[in-house]
Amino acid sequence: MLSFLSACNSDNVSNQTEGSENTPAISGTALQRGCASEEIRQAALKNSSELRQKYSEIEARTERFENDMKLGKVLSDGTVEIPVVVNVLYRTTSENVSDARIAEQIAVLNADYAGTNTDVSKIPSEFQGVKAGDVKVRFRLANVVRKSTTKTSWSTNDAMKKASTGGIDATSPSNYLNIWTVGNMGQILGYATFPESSGLWNDGVVIASPYFGKTGASSPFNLGRTATHEVGHYLNLRHIWGDANCGNDLVADTPTQTTSNAGKPSYPLYNTCSGVQRSVMFMNYMDYVDDAAMFMFSAGQKTRMQSVVASSGARSGLRIN
């Protein structure tokens, strides 16, 4: 999730070591990304045995898909195009994001997931060998739904996703990626549901309107990367630090790091976990750095995302529209 609620980071002035203080070391800005996706996920898993079962099945299916890829059993079946419904909840003119800004956000998603973003050339040479390139996922705007509201703030309780609580009901969540834009969410930039929630009434992505799209968005999160990050969660990516000190994001080619990074770190940035010092991939879309400092997915992340939109994947329903 991108509100980056548990926003934390490290910079290269004071390199991070396992077990060190996790207070973010801010580089370049006082405003930090906040994403609550993983916190919300863990709460949902704790309260639902059905979701826990789906989660386990998805992870097992992902592992099989990864092994089949390694064995050459998975052939390219072309790019998957995901239809998107943008649900705009607004109180003020600035919160009523324009059609042009929505188109701009869809364009950012398409560039970032195709690996054609203009800043892809900034990927350091040490990570060139594991960059995702084209994830083979595209996004097509299917509809925009707008609704005026008197609410001055929103939280992560999913009220924006139900008409009965002042929001907008999702459009066929099994078959469409629903994105809700809302006004103020405090320190949260956005959040998303993971594939085990596929088809549920609350399935989709939420983004605070100041961080949606580019034109008129708030710096340093004004390049549309909040959506890139949150859609990554929607497609089964975890935060790159595994939401724990030297945690596991279930991706083999992303270096283990002590915690999240924020601001605009200078490369190289080193962390030490289990006594091993590594240069970390802070420019990954699943970290917490500023929009201008993130510009890549890894090949391992690509495989995880492809597994959920495959014909046997948890989000295969997105393929039929």
Predicted regions and their residues:
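C-terminal motif of bacterial Sec signal peptides marking the signal peptidase cleavage site
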Residues: F4-A7
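Bacterial signal peptide processing site
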Residues: N9-N12
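Propeptide-to-catalytic entry region of secreted or membrane-anchored zinc metalloproteases
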Residues: T17-P173, A310, A314-R315, N321
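Soluble periplasmic/extracytoplasmic beta-strand elements of cell-envelope proteins
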Residues: P83-N87, N178-W180, V206, Y285
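Short, histidine-centered active-site or binding-site loop motifs used for metal coordination
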Residues: V86-Y90, Y211, D290
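Soluble non-cytosolic domains of exported or imported proteins
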Residues: N96-E104, S218-N222, T226, V280, ...
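Metzincin-family zinc-dependent endopeptidase catalytic domain
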Residues: A103-L269
